Every structure is written in structure tokens, then in C-alpha cells.
Amino acid sequence: MVRPLGRGAWPRAWLRVVVVAVTVASTWLTFDRLRVSGDLSTLLPESGDAAALVRWTRAFGVREPAIVLLRGDRPADVEAAADRVAAVLRGAASIASVMDRAPAPDPPSDPTLAWAFAGPEARARLAEAVTAEGMRARLRDTRALLLAPAAGSEAEAWLARDPLRLFQIPWEARAELAAGVPAAAGAAFTADGGRARLVIAEPRGSAFVSSNAEAVVEDVERAKAAVAAAGISGITIELTGGHAIAWATEQMMRRDLEVSGTLSLVLASLAFVATFRRVRALVAVLPPLVLGTLWTTGLAALLPSGLSAVAIGFAAVVVGVGVDTGVHVYAALLEARRAGLSPGDAARRARAVTWQPTLMAAAVAAVAFASLAFCGLKAVRELGLLCGAGELLTAIAILLVTPEIGSWLERAAPPPPSPARWVDVLVSLTGTRARAWIALLVCAAPIAVVAVWGWPRAGSALVALRPRALEPLAVQERVYALFGGQPGQWIVLSTDPDEDRARTRADAIAEALEPLARARTIDGYDSLSTFLPSEETQRARLAVRDALDLPSRRSTLESALRESGFDLDACAGALDAFAHPSARAFAPPGALGTTLSWLTARHVAKDARGAIVATYVRPVRTPSDDARVRAAILAADPGAAITGFEAIDAALRAVLGRDLVLVGAVALLLVTLAMRLVLRSVRRAFVALATLACEVAAVGVAMNVLGIHWHVYDALVLPVLFGVTIDESMFLLHAARETTMRAALHAQGPLVTATALTTAAGFFALVFCRFDGLRDLGAVGAVGVVAGLVSALVVVPAALCIIEGADKGSDKRTSV
């Protein structure tokens, strides 16, 4: 036989030492090690296209450029402010490089190396440029440039090396950089007639390291202060990019954790007092509740990657659910004191009679939460495990501490409890078979409504991935609107253990996309291929050049130069390049230095599995065009992975369909087994399960009425409610084994109402979070708990009346 937890256990010194040690360790972990993570990849499934997005997020999300958007009414002021911001950021410790103009690689000594960086269209124009007519046309334009008033000695020098301006041809068309931002080589990133301008910076360090993200944001704030100090007014300066988004996400999550946890405590306390009607009981319940939450937070601090955006909801849920145990323990203490037991004996009695049902209820709820461990989303797994652990830890803390505090508070015998009048109304409504049938039909009505009306529509499964409240994401939208591009781009990943092979495959994708962009089959793309193609790609392109037999065209170039009035001696280097074209692959000077290093970081990364090269494609979202683009990409690189936040919607819906069934089945099975063991009756276990069916249907109706849509995060809370809300039915059915249903309702009705409302308060606190996914999760949880309470209070007495007769709830022989 299991020995009751409370018989002399708490006064033992070793138990006090353990509690103190665990509390001290949890406090240290909470304040020293607890951190939240801005890594949104924890919200994604780790399979299919979504797995590719997770890999991209972890490899590239840490290196995304910081984009500063400046806007004003006067272009001259915007330009001056941009120059000031760029100057400050170039001296900032958090910034590796700054680019306020599109890169313009210096021409090499051999201008025929232009073929190494030319895509299909540029190669065609290069071939035209080295014909006799093409040479004369380009030389006429070169002569005009040299005669222009702005021409200087530097321009004269490079035009002498490359009088045909061959090296300009790969970049003469607009070059696309991050997120489709276009600019001609050497030009500033401007829009709206110069009233909007971008400054692009390459941050140092990972965006997922809080100190790095904070440093970038602070340095941009210093740049804004420098603009104001220079007397440049009327300029708005805004920041977006990976570091800004990560920092804003972390601040939002910290705010949500603090607000939801505090609000949950306040709302649960108010619900407790309103239903339990004994304010002093809060003094006995809140300290162990805080203690159990602290222990759970200590466990959360051990998560290696920090708390995810969904997992931070554990605190509010644990507080709301944890009060349940306190309600039943303190009620048992009051009952023992009314029976004449001394405060100490009453504390031991309360612990002895409640430890088994409360721990069983906590275990059922904890297992229901832990069933989320079968989910394919890491963030949801963390939420389930933390809530499950918190449910058990708070129950243990309350069993240990609440009776001791209560024995001190209840020195005087409490007065008899005043009867709850609403219980008499409920008994009257379910006291006869006819009324019981009517009550059951009313509770079952939502099942029929859902069958006719249908389940709530599935909303965007990505609702929690891009929090609408984040200012850097709003800035990103403004950049799209001003400079072109659009959200929802595809991310095409070419991977290989060897970096050059991966880059070669990405170059092939870029060549396949170029004609599609010209035909407007896609809105555009940006690739590293134009600025830094792989050595293999460069050699292949130079082979195209060599097929033109440039040495045979040297004399044609010489004649064209002479006819156009150029000095042949000054252009001797260009003539020698035609006679002896370079055969080696070439990297433009500074390509791996400060000028283009951020472009390399945006497109090339490495992880444990090898090199990853990303190409960013903006589809036009026409099914036929998108299908053509996918086919072209996979034809160029059959091993490429096409992903993106919009592209993984199907993957998330698949996860929702699979996990909802799996998690629901596990939770329902465990709850059924627990009910059978606790109630020792098949019929009464079936009654408890019937309350769940009514609850689920009521949730469906409420979501339809309130306009709450299903998505992958709020849908998965529904199976968890099986374990959380079954408590109400279990306590009512357990009490009905020992007495009449009327007495059971009077004894347990107010208590289960208190526990349900405090649980609902915990979920409801999440509605005030700024994170979209948590708000919906909290709304569904709160609605579900209230629906479960109403179902239990009506279905249990009505069903027992029909099954066992009006007065047979106390007949122990009815157990099966």
C-alpha cells in the first residue's frame, strides 16, 4: 500500500534541504541562464521543404544584412543623412562593412575576362560588341565619355585599358541585390525621386546571439543621433534585417513572457477568490504556486537553444493549471478543521486525503501536455514538456507547502461553507430522467451544429512565423513597396560538400532564371553568379569567349580604334588582351573583402553537412508560371531544394493533420486509461469521455462564432485539453461514488468551477501576447476549458441520472 505523502514527510530535514537546494538552483538558472531565442526555425517542421528552410534559417539567418531605410521630403537632406549614417556605421564595432552604393568591380588588365561574369544575355551582347560594327558603336560612346566635362584621369586610364567597355556589359542591366533591391553599378540605392535611400551593412556575429543583435540596433541608434546632431531634420531612419528582427522578436517574447505570466497570476487569483470565496487561501496557495513555476522556469533555462516563441507560453499555463491542486488541498484542510481536527492534524489529514487524486489529476494533465512531444515542431514539443513538468512540479509544491501555511492561517475553526445556490439549480435541471435527457441534448447540440455548420476554417498555418507586431517586418514591407520586390520569395538551395561545386550548380540556376526574368515569368531574382561565379562557371564562360577567336579580331579592333581617333599606344593593353586572352579564372579585386563580403555572406554558407548556396527568386504567383519556374530550376540543378515561408504552407498543414491525429490519439488513450483506473467503472469512464466530445464540439462552434481559425499551433492545444479538463469530470464522478450526486455537486461543484476558471485564466492571459500564435493558442485554450467545465457540470449528473437512476449516484454496486 502506498504511504500517504503527508504523514510526517514535510518536517523531515532532508526534504527541506532538497526543496531549498532545488529552489536556489532554479533561481540562479532563471536569472542567470534563462534566455529567449529569436530563431524562428523552431516553429517549422523538420521535414520536406520546411527542413530546407530550417537549414537555410540556421545557416543564413545569422548573416542577413542590416538594411537602413532613410526617407525625407528633400533628396539632398536624405543623401546627407545617408552619408552620415554610412560614416558612423563604418566605424561601429558591430559592423563589418557598409555599402551605400551598388558594387562596381574594377576592370582587370584583361577586359576579355568580362565573359567570366556574363550570363546568357550579357554573353550575347559581348559577342555583338566584338564584331566590327559593334566595336565602332561602343567606341563612339567611349569617345563621348572621354570628352564629357566630368571625365577625369581615372576614367581615362580604365577606358584606355578597356576602350570597348567590355567589363561593364555584365552589369549594364540592373543588378539585383538583397530582396530585389535594384541599382546600376556604382549608383546609390534610391527610390521615390531620391526621397528614399538605403544603406546596407554587414553585421558581425550571429543574429541569434542576443548581444550581437542588440549591438547592431544600438549602433544604428547612434547613427540616427549623429544625423540629428548634424542638424539634418525631417528624416525618418528605420532598420530591418536579420539582427533587427531577431532583437525585436526577443524583446517581444520577453514582454509576452512577463505580461502573460503576471496576468495569469492575477486573473487566476481573482478567479480563485471569486469561486472559492476565501481570500486568505491565496496566501497558502500562491507561494507554492510561484515555487513550482520557478522550478519549471529553471528547467526551461536548461534548453540549449533558449525558449522559443511558442514555448514562452508555459508560465501562464502552468500558473493557471497549477492552482487546481491548491483548491482541492485547501478545501480538504478546511473540511478537516470543521471536523474538529487541530491545525497540525488538519494539515496532515488534507495531505493524506488529497495527494492521490490530485497527483493523479496532475499526472493525467502532465501526460496530456507531454503528448505534444510527438509533434513535429520543436517549439510545440518544448511547450508540451515544460507545461507537463510544471503541472507536476506545482502539484508537488502545493502538497508540500500549502497544508503547512494553511494550518497557520486556520488557527480558528472556519465557519460552515455557505451553499452555492447555483448548484441547487443545476441539480434541479438534471434531477429527473426527462430533465436529464433535455440537459444532455442541450450539451450535445454543438455536435449537431458542427456537423451542419462545419469545423472552423483553417487559417494561415504560418500565422505564428511572421509576427505582425514587429516593427522591423513593417520596415521590410516599406522597403519592398519603395524599391520593388515582394514578400514570399522562394529560397533555392544548392548544396554540396564542395563549395565550388555547390556554387556551380547555383550558377546554372541563375542562367536558367535569366530568360524567365526577361520574359516576366518571374518578378526577378538575385544570385551571386553575376558578382562572383564559381571557378568552374568562369572557365565554361571563358570557353565561350575563346570560341569567338578573339586573336583573329585584333586587327579589326586596331582598325576601329584608329578610325575612332584613339591612341593605339595608349590602348596597347587592350590590343594585347585580344591577341592573348587570359585563360585563368578570375575573381574581381575586393570581391571577398569589404565591398562584396556581405553579398557572399548572403548567398554562401556552410554547416555540418557542407556548403549551401542560396538563390532568391520572386515568383509572380501564377500557377502556370510558377510551375515553369520550378521545372527550369530543377532542370538546371536536379538536387536543388525550393523552399520559403510561403512554400512550406503545405508542409505545415501536413504536420497539423498528422500531429493532431497522433497527439489526440495518445492523449485520449492515456486519459481513458487513467479514468478507468481512477473510477474503476467502464460506464463512468464513458461518461467522462462524453464530456470531452461535448467540449470539443462547443469549441468548434465558439471558434466559428468568434472568427478564430485553426492553425498548426492552436489546433494542437485541443488534445491537451483532454487531460486538463478531464479533472472536473473525474472529481465529480469520484465524489459520486461515496455519496449522492446532489451532495457531490455541492461538495465538488464550487471546487471544480474554481479550478476550471483559474485554468481558463491562465490560457486567457496569453490572449494579451503580441505573438500571433500565442494569442490564438490562449483563446482556444480558454474557450476549451470553459466548455469543458460546463460539459462536466451538466453531462456528469445528467448521464448518471439516466444510467443509474435519480438517486443511484451513491450506489456503490453500480460500478462495473
Predicted segments — roles?
Residues 29-73, 176-188, 428-437, 454-498, ...:
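Solvent-exposed, non-transmembrane loop/terminal regulatory segments of multi-pass membrane proteins
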Residues 281-329, 684-732:
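Hydrophobic transmembrane alpha-helices and their membrane-interface caps
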Residues 436-560:
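Juxtamembrane segments of multi-pass membrane proteins
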Residues 286, 338-375, 739-769, 789:
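Pore- and gate-forming transmembrane helices of large, multi-pass membrane proteins
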Residues 151-279, 507, 576-671:
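Extracytoplasmic
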Residues 302, 318-331, 355-375, 379-418, ...:
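Transmembrane alpha-helices and their membrane-interface boundaries in multi-pass membrane transporters
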Residues 1-38, 404, 408, 412-461, ...:
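Signature of alpha-helical transmembrane segments and their immediate interfacial
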Residues 26-28, 83-198, 212, 519-600:
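Alpha-helical transmembrane helix bundles of large polytopic membrane transport and channel proteins
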